[in-house]
């Protein structure tokens, strides 16, 4: 003991370890819920499960669903005990609750440490942000513009895409007619970024340095958020000071705020042309909110869109590249749509129902998140069946396992690119099976109060990118190899970020379209 007293580093280590174990013990009991446990039990066992959560998360959720699909189960994670709600009635009960009971933003905020990395998703500052309904209205405004044949929005959107595709993919559609390989994810992510910036920030999409900045920011947020979360609250501001995300966020806020000011000086009565214009006008009409509160919301929307949209785009391209039997029917549909609707119009994209089905099946077969409808109980909550959740509990629904449940999706372990097209034909309810349709059995875009409002814009981007690629090019995996395996991190499934595909320009006849 004298040695310990004379060695401050050892004393500090003992105090730190004791404090950590105490906090872990408190967290263990405070977040405990009276439902079955999947994984290791007990204080030590749950601690081991927490460490292994990074690798075992998706397997734990699958196992829990198979054993408890009519009720619920809990798993030990770095956030404490998280509860997976499998019962339909219980899911319906919590998914539409207000944020003062079950908050989706609180989960996002904690996951990405938004206070430091993503101010537009900071739960602690939610009262200062432009409200979620206003954000949803701005995205609905963009959706309505895209659907209006007399509005220049969608033709401008297509031109922005064509320019971005040429600059970023760097494979000329007019030849040479040879296979050219390149890394799929980084190239297509920049195309998605350019399209998203076009919708959110308009003319700023023409500034490559802004695309660079936004792409870099989107890459570092998950990394910095994960790193900051490793530290206790008292140390997080210090750790964040040495991370890139806060500095990049400040730079983006400055650039976009200056652009809004420039537009205001140029024309005080400017008619909104993009989401930033719309949000700036909303702030004018609703005193009490700052321009910065709108800007950080726009930036958070960009982050929310670029990763999910790029991942589904890449998954779809990898599936097409390794399933040649779908190329001709999809290509024929694209050609017919372009002829019938006069080129790359919104109506043409909407009429590509087989392509829509293929993309949705690629999403089902490669679910981004094994969980969906993630919420944090912002106060103690009790389900109608008596199950109690203490304040702070994280809950989610088993998105991944449901998508492979044979009772919901017959032959779910097999890829069927026309699955949803055939269901639409059989039931005569086409809108029930579109990519953008959310339901209690298909939670990829969420469901209920926080169904993703940006899914319509994302669907336009993905369908346009995939249709253009398939129409103008033959596609294959590099060296005509097999589909690269996905990688997982916690609940998340990613396509192989380093996977390379090959494109070869097609020799199109003049009658085939443009």
Swiss-Prot record:
Annotated compartments: Membrane
Listed PROSITE patterns: CYTOCHROME_P450 (PS00086)
Recorded metabolic or biological pathway in which this protein acts: Secondary metabolite biosynthesis
Positions contributing to heme binding: 452
Cofactor requirement: heme
Keyword match Signal: no
MF annotations from Gene Ontology: heme binding; iron ion binding; monooxygenase activity; oxidoreductase activity, acting on paired donors, with incorporation or reduction of molecular oxygen
SUPFAM superfamilies xrefs: Cytochrome P450
Keyword Metal-binding among record annotations: yes
GO cellular component, one term: membrane
Assigned EC number: 1.-.-.-
Glycosylation sites: 148, 486
GO biological process, alphabetically ordered: mycotoxin biosynthetic process
Keywords: Glycoprotein, Heme, Iron, Membrane, Metal-binding, Monooxygenase, Oxidoreductase, Transmembrane, Transmembrane helix
Enzyme class: oxidoreductase
InterPro entries assigned: Cyt_P450, Cyt_P450_CS, Cyt_P450_E_grp-I, Cyt_P450_sf
Membrane-related topology note: Single-pass membrane protein
Gene3D superfamilies: Cytochrome P450
Annotated disulfide bonds: none
Stated role: Cytochrome P450 monooxygenase; part of the gene cluster that mediates the biosynthesis of the indole diterpenes penitrems. The geranylgeranyl diphosphate (GGPP) synthase ptmG catalyzes the first step in penitrem biosynthesis via conversion of farnesyl pyrophosphate and isopentyl pyrophosphate into geranylgeranyl pyrophosphate (GGPP). Condensation of indole-3-glycerol phosphate with GGPP by the prenyl transferase ptmC then forms 3-geranylgeranylindole (3-GGI).
Family that this chain belongs to: Belongs to the cytochrome P450 family.
Protein name: Cytochrome P450 monooxygenase ptmQ
Naturally occurring in which organism (per UniProt): Penicillium ochrochloron
């Amino acid at each position: 003991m004298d040695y310990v007293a004379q060695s401050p580093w050892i004393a500090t280590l003992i105090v730190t370890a004791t404090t950590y174990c105490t906090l872990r013990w408190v967290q263990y009991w405070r977040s405990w819920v009276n439902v079955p446990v999947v994984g290791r039990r007990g204080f030590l066992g749950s601690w081991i499960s927490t460490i292994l959560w990074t690798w075992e998360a998706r397997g734990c959720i699958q196992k829990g669903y198979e054993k408890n699909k009519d009720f619920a189960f809990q798993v030990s994670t770095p956030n404490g005990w998280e509860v997976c709600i499998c019962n339909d009635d219980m899911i319906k009960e919590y998914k539409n609750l207000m944020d003062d009971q079950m908050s989706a933003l609180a989960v996002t905020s904690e996951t990405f440490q938004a206070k430091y990395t993503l101010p537009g998703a900071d739960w602690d500052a939610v009262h200062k942000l432009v409200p979620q309904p206003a954000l949803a209205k701005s995205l609905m405004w963009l959706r309505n513009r895209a659907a209006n044949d007399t509005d220049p929005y969608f033709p401008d959107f297509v031109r922005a895409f064509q320019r971005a595709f040429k600059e970023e993919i760097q494979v000329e559609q007019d030849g040479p007619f040879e296979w050219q390989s390149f890394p799929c994810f980084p190239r297509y992510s920049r195309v998605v970024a350019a399209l998203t910036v076009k919708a959110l920030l308009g003319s700023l999409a023409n500034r490559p340095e802004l695309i660079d900045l936004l792409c870099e920011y989107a890459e570092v947020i998950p990394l910095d958020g994960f790193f900051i979360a490793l530290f206790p609250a008292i140390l997080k501001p210090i750790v964040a000071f040495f991370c890139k995300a806060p500095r990049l966020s400040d730079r983006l806020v400055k650039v976009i705020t200056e652009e809004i000011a420039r537009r205001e000086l140029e024309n005080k009565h400017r008619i909104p042309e993009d989401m930033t214009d719309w949000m700036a006008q909303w702030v004018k009409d609703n005193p009490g909110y700052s321009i910065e509160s709108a800007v950080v919301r726009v930036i958070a929307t960009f982050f929310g869109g670029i990763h999910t949209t790029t991942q589904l785009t890449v998954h779809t391209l990898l599936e097409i590249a390794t399933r040649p039997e779908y190329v001709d029917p999809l290509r024929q549909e694209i050609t017919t749509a372009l002829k019938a609707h006069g080129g790359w119009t919104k109506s043409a994209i909407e009429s590509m129902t087989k392509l829509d089905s293929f993309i949705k099946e690629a999403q089902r077969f490669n679910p981004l998140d094994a969980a969906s409808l993630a919420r944090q109980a912002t106060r103690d909550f009790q389900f109608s069946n008596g199950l109690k959740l203490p304040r702070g509990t994280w809950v989610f629904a088993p998105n991944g396992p449901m998508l492979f449940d044979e009772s919901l999706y017959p032959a779910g372990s097999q890829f069927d690119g026309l699955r949803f097209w055939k269901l639409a034909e059989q039931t005569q309810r086409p809108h029930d099976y579109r990519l953008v349709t959310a339901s209690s059995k298909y939670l990829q875009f969420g469901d209920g109060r926080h169904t993703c409002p940006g899914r319509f814009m994302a669907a336009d981007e993905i369908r346009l990118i995939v249709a253009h690629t398939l129409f103008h090019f033959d596609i294959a995996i590099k060296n005509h190899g097999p589909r690269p395996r996905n990688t997982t991190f916690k609940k998340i499934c990613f396509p192989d970020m380093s996977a390379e595909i090959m494109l070869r320009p097609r020799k199109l006849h003049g009658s085939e379209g443009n």
